[in-house]
Amino acid sequence: NGINLRTDPVEAKKYIGFLPQRPPLYPELSVDEYLTYCARLRLMDAREIRQAVDTAEAKCGITHFKKRLIGNLSGGYQQRVGIAQAIVHNPRFVVLDEPTNGLDPVQIVEVRHLIKEIAAERAVMLSTHILSEVQATCDKIKMIEHGHMIFSGTMEEFNNYVEPCSFLVTFGNP
């Protein structure tokens, strides 16, 4: 966008959404209260907050939990609330750090689907150490090792890149 994060961080952060590995949730707040609080932290216009919260809740499939306390939600729904706070201000770029960490298999599939929906509308960067997460969610991959990019390409190119490093382990019957 041409905005320098170092010289104009407040303006630049308007275009960035972030979900840390452990979402910064307040269990004593309702989903609505929390997302409204996050929108205010993002310096959103007060007249736009209600609509922005409703839109984020709908996108993340948590509309029916808007009045529930976050502490009473399952891990999967808490993660959805975390994702909602990352998109409530409608950023152009969203960073998700280990978004399926600690979720059960059904919740993982649901959150992956949600990530793909969000990625259809804006740029999403997924930070993860789980290869299956990358394969199930990403179109383009950049691999960083010790602060240096060691791979950049498509999923197909990535599969060819890691194939020589892979091996298959099989177990026979005892």
Mark where each language-model region is:
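ABC transporter nucleotide-binding domains
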Residues: 1-145, 150-151
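Short, charged/small-residue-rich alpha-helical element at the C-terminal edge
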Residues: 165-174
